[in-house]
Swiss-Prot record:
<feature type="region of interest" description="Disordered">
    <location>
        <begin position="1"/>
        <end position="32"/>
    </location>
</feature>
<keyword id="KW-0175">Coiled coil</keyword>
<feature type="region of interest" description="Disordered">
    <location>
        <begin position="374"/>
        <end position="397"/>
    </location>
</feature>
<feature type="region of interest" description="Disordered">
    <location>
        <begin position="458"/>
        <end position="493"/>
    </location>
</feature>
<feature type="coiled-coil region">
    <location>
        <begin position="77"/>
        <end position="264"/>
    </location>
</feature>
<comment type="similarity">
    <text>Belongs to the WEB family.</text>
</comment>
<dbReference type="Pfam" id="PF05701">
    <property type="entry name" value="WEMBL"/>
</dbReference>
<feature type="coiled-coil region">
    <location>
        <begin position="299"/>
        <end position="376"/>
    </location>
</feature>
<dbReference type="InterPro" id="IPR008545">
    <property type="entry name" value="Web"/>
</dbReference>
<protein>
    <recommendedName>
        <fullName>WEB family protein At2g38370</fullName>
    </recommendedName>
</protein>
<feature type="compositionally biased region" description="Basic and acidic residues">
    <location>
        <begin position="473"/>
        <end position="486"/>
    </location>
</feature>
Length: 522
């Protein structure tokens, strides 16, 4: 019987026809149930009949023996190939099982991941009741906070509006009071000038002169500053001209070098021409013949050398001329800058002289003003002492000031006798208690305004004191006078008039403030 391949084996004929390099094909068909089915599938079956009558010849036996050996060898090789293919199939099956296992693992992981994601989504969508209540309570708290913040903002806005209204009212009151103060001061100045007459006109003239001198000093300062700016500009121009001169010198040096190089090139060209002409003369003398082409080449080279030398010389000369022209321009600019510097110096010196003259005239005007004020004050005291009557008299000291019941000053009248002079206390015109109180209230309110104005504004005396060096002595004199006044007030306390001395101190302070206000207005 013929041997049939079992199920799960490989067909060797197909492998041999397709080649050994190809992969084996696995038979996955169902196994045969019977031998007849297998025989019908592979070409049928037949009955075996032994041939006993016919004996084979010796030649036929010899021919069949090698065929059997070859078939055995082929069968052995086929068995080997079968074993190899079976091993390969086993490896492939193992790989398939491994891939199936990995695929199953991946599917399990994917399913677990999908289940986790679904659970998380469900948990996120469906929150517990406690979390929802907490969120609601927090939202309510936030709303309450926002409402309280809005209420506080509205309250602050109302307060700001009230404060603005109060500030506007206080500004209006201050403006009214300042207008009243200015009107009162104007009336006081008018009354003073009406009383003084000619002396007031002189005072106004002196003040106008002082103002004019201060303006002149400011103008001189401005001119000095302008002159300084001009000097700075001139110095900058001189520096720029110096830089230009340096560049011109560098260009001159370069032009000289170019000129020397051109001269050297010209000398080389002349030497070449002489050499060529010498060689030509020698050739003529020796009767050496040169072809026309060589002669034309030599002539062209000589002409080219001459033209190059001429061009170089012309370029060098033009550069030298340009450098000379630029040098002349720079020198002219330097001279102009020097002249401008000299003129600016002269202007500065003139401005300084004007400033010195203005300072000297200003000092003289201030001294004249002080003298006039001191003389005018003495005249006022003398006139008031003659017109008024005496009220109190000091027994211990004749030079001390006395006060009346209302807190007014008592001045002294100097009576010149034949042998000795005596001082008589006289009384200034009295004021009512309401006038005194209103005056004190006005001064207390005006002092707050004047403190701020004194910080921003400067009086004429302070402006003039910056430039004058003689104001230091004046300040020392004023300090001495203030110290004398303090000693006098201390002496008054020894009389036992405690209330009167306090009122006197307050009134002296008020007078100082009035003087400052008058200076600021002037």
């Amino acid at each position: 019987m013929a041997e049939f391949p079992e199920p799960g084996t490989v067909n060797p004929d197909s492998d041999l026809s397709n080649g050994r390099a190809e992969k084996p094909e696995i038979d996955t068909s169902a196994p045969f149930e019977s031998v007849r089915e297998a025989a019908t599938r592979f070409g049928g079956f037949g009955f075996w009949r032994p041939s006993l009558n016919k004996l084979p010849d010796a030649s036929q036996e010899n021919i069949q023996e090698p065929d059997i050996m070859g078939l055995k060898a082929q069968a052995f090789e086929l068995q080997r190939e079968l074993i190899v293919k079976e091993r390969e199939t086993l490896e492939v099956l193992k790989e398939l099982e491994a891939t199936k296992a990995t695929v199953l693992k991946l599917q399990q992981r994917n399913e677990a991941y999908e289940e986790d994601t679904l659970r998380e989504e469900v948990d996120s969508h469906i929150k517990p009741a406690g979390v929802v209540l907490k969120d609601l309570s927090q939202a309510k708290m936030n709303l309450c906070k926002i409402a309280s913040i809005r209420e506080s903002v509205e309250q602050l806005k109302n307060k700001l509006n009230e404060e603005r209204a109060a500030l506007e009212k206080t500004r209006e009151r201050l403006m009214e009071k300042s207008l009243k103060v200015f009107s009162l001061e104007e009336e006081e100045v008018r009354v003073r000038f009406a009383k003084e007459g000619q002396t007031g006109e002189k005072d106004l003239g002196m003040l106008n002169e002082v103002q004019r001198l201060s303006r002149q000093a400011q103008e001189v300062k401005k001119t000095g500053e302008n002159a300084e700016l001009e000097v700075v500009k001139a110095m900058a121009e001189t520096e720029s001209t110096r830089d230009k001169i340096r560049t011109a010198k560098i260009r001159l040096v370069a032009a000289r070098k170019m000129k020397e190089a051109a001269r050297e090139a010209e000398a080389v060209a002349i030497a070449e021409i002489e050499a060529v002409t010498g060689s030509m003369n020698v050739g003529k003398a020796e009767a050496v013949t040169i072809s026309a082409e060589e002669y034309s080449v030599l002539a062209r080279s000589a002409r080219d050398a001459e033209e190059e030398a001429r061009k170089r010389v012309e370029d060098a000369m033009s550069r030298v001329e340009e450098a000379n022209v630029s040098k002349k321009d720079v020198l002219k600019k330097v001279d102009e800058a020097a002249q401008e510097i000299e003129t600016s110096k002269r202007v500065l010196e003139e401005a300084v002289e004007r400033v010195d003259a203005a300072n000297a005239s200003k000092i003289e005007a201030e001294e004249a003003l002080r003298k006039w004020r001191s003389e005018n004050g003495q005249r006022r005291r003398l006139s008031s002492s003659v017109n008024n009557t005496s009220k109190f008299k000091s027994r211990r000291e004749t030079t001390t000031r006395l006060m009346d019941v209302n807190g007014l000053h008592l001045t002294y009248d100097v009576v010149d006798g034949s042998s000795s002079s005596s001082t008589v206390p006289v009384l200034k015109p009295t004021m009512s208690i309401g006038q005194i109180l209103s005056k004190k209230l006005l001064l207390a309110e005006d002092s707050d305004m004047n403190v701020a104005n004194e910080r921003r504004k400067m009086s004429l005396g302070q402006m003039l004191a910056k430039n004058s060096s003689s104001d230091k002595t004046v300040s020392k004199r004023s300090e001495g006078k203030e110290n004398e006044k303090r000693t006098k007030t201390r002496k008054r306390k020894s009389f036992g008039f405690a209330k009167i001395s306090v009122l006197l101190n307050k009134e002296s302070k008020n007078k100082k403030k009035k003087k400052k206000i008058a200076l600021n207005l002037r």
